[in-house]
């Protein structure tokens, strides 16, 4: 959203993201396993005074580079260790990404202030962007790095100034420090396919100079990454060194089977990622019309290469997660925003509005009419009867004025805010690790050792401000550990809350649909009869 005079409308953007961040902070804790893990890694680095090698539960943590952790530390240095600062990082980055999308729209379509008005609006209200703008993940950060690099590509194309390749290299280097070599998937299609998207534009450079600039930027990016990776590899040991130099490239990009999905999965998920916009048939028609009538347009071609390049490459990789495609959302916002600007809608967005209304009515009906039900329907049935009201209001808001995209955008924001307030907040106690973490901290303060059943994702380290790692052992070995540590305690898990409790627990708390329990050596006998705990989700 930008002022009609072509200036960015900071006030509206800030209010938009402040509302989202405030609702998220008030409605839910940091969620296990990912958010709590990243907080714990930052906490352990802080405790150790080691800002070179990330650590998780006492061991070097090779799954993620350190840039997000450094941003967490920067806030802690200024305001002290807190829970709230890390959770403001993504909203602040999303604000920066909104401005960068506005700036790209102004540069690609300088005569169309309406495109710069609408593209940030589409981005800010798309479901996937909203979800991760309030979550402590790496993907809004890598989206910012991609926007830095792609802004440099556009400026180099329009001005011919070689200095922009230094900025491109900065985007590459920071992207590697944010999430590894995946940044190249977001940057290289547009950089390498410039002869196609610049085919009908004036070029103030030679192609040899262009590709020389791309190579220079890549070398600079590699140098920035190696400035961290080499000393970190030397400090973290051989296993860590091998992991960051090899595991972050071949294994995580090509041989990732943890989230294996079919090649068409992203294409099928796009209407959800870009909800509510891709459920508006008239907008899709406008996009097709714009592509047909302006096929030679530099901006459209650039955004298409950016979006389709990432979509095709990530579709070909076995491991797929929704947030992998987040850096391509600004490209989609540019395409949809320009289509709305060139061919303004005159109809109401019936399909996304009816989807919201149906969701709200269905949730309220389930809460009123369904009894003792298992699974996700049981979760919905346990919500208050008014839990669907916000979705109905959001749908009616979208219909309130024909051909008015801001109403649809505000409906999208309202729907997500209501999801956090009405749905996630009642479920929050089952995802709050602080009570168990506090109990663990009490035992550690007494000098008593603590173990965890199964794979440990460090979910308690930051929440309890723990200063010692936990032993991670499966049930049979954990029983032996309790016998050999008579003053020790262990965290064990029941997969469902209704499961019978075979232990005499010192403390118990709801945990992700089941129960976490703190036991001592009296529970060792019960542990010996247990199957090994299921392995929880791995790294993404």
Each PLM stretch: what is its role?
Residues 1-348, 512-515:
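Membrane-integral, polyisoprenol-dependent glycosyltransferases
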Residues 2-3, 166, 170, 284-540:
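Membrane-embedded architecture of ER/inner-membrane glycosylation machinery
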């Amino acid at each position: 959203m930008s002022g009609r005079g072509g200036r960015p409308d900071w006030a509206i953007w800030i209010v938009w993201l402040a509302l989202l961040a405030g609702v998220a902070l008030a409605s839910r804790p940091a969620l296990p396993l990912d958010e709590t893990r990243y907080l714990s890694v930052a906490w352990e680095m802080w405790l150790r005074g080691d800002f070179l090698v990330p650590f998780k539960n006492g061991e070097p943590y090779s799954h993620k580079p350190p840039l997000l952790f450094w941003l967490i530390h920067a806030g802690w240095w200024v305001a002290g260790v807190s829970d709230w600062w890390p959770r403001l990082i993504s909203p602040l980055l999303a604000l920066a990404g909104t401005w960068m999308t506005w700036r790209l729209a102004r540069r690609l379509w300088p005569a169309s202030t309406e495109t710069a008005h609408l593209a940030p609006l589409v981005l800010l209200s798309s479901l996937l962007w909203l979800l991760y703008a309030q979550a402590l993940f790496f993907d809004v950060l890598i989206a910012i790095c991609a926007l830095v690099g792609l802004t440099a590509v556009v400026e180099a194309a329009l001005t011919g100034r070689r200095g922009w390749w230094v900025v491109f290299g900065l985007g590459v280097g920071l992207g590697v420090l944010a999430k590894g070599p995946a940044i190249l998937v977001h940057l290289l299609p547009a950089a390498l396919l410039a002869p196609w998207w610049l085919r009908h534009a004036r070029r103030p450079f030679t192609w040899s100079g262009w590709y020389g600039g791309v190579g220079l930027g890549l070398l600079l990016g590699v140098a920035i990454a190696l400035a961290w990776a080499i000393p970190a590899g030397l400090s973290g040991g051989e296993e860590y060194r091998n992991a960051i130099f090899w595991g972050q490239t071949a294994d995580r990009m090509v041989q990732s089977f943890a989230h294996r999905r079919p090649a068409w999965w992203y294409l099928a998920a796009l209407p959800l990622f870009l909800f509510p916009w891709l459920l508006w048939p008239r907008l899709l028609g406008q996009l097709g019309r714009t592509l047909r009538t302006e096929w030679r347009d530099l901006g459209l071609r650039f955004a298409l290469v950016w979006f389709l390049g990432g979509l095709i490459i990530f579709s070909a990789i076995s491991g797929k997660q929704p947030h992998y495609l987040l850096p391509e959302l600004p490209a989609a916002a540019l395409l949809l925003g320009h289509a709305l600007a060139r061919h303004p809608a005159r109809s109401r967005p019936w399909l996304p509005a009816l989807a919201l209304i149906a969701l709200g009515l269905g949730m309220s009906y389930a809460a009123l009419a369904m009894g003792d039900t298992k699974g996700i329907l049981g979760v919905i049935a346990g919500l208050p009867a008014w839990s669907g009201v916000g979705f109905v209001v959001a749908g009616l808001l979208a219909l309130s004025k024909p051909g008015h995209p801001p109403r649809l955008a505000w409906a999208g924001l309202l729907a997500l805010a209501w999801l956090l307030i009405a749905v996630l907040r009642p479920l929050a106690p089952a995802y709050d690790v602080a009570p168990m973490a506090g109990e663990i901290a009490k035992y550690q303060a007494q000098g008593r050792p603590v173990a965890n059943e199964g794979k440990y994702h460090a979910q308690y380290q930051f929440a309890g401000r723990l200063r010692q790692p936990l032993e991670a052992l499966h049930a049979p070995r954990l029983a032996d550990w309790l016998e050999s540590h008579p003053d020790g305690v262990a965290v064990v898990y029941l997969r469902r809350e209704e499961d019978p409790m075979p232990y005499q627990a010192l403390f118990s708390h709801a945990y992700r649909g089941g129960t976490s329990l703190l036991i001592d050596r009296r529970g060792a006998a019960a542990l010996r009869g247990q199957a090994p705990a299921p392995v929880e989700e791995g790294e993404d």
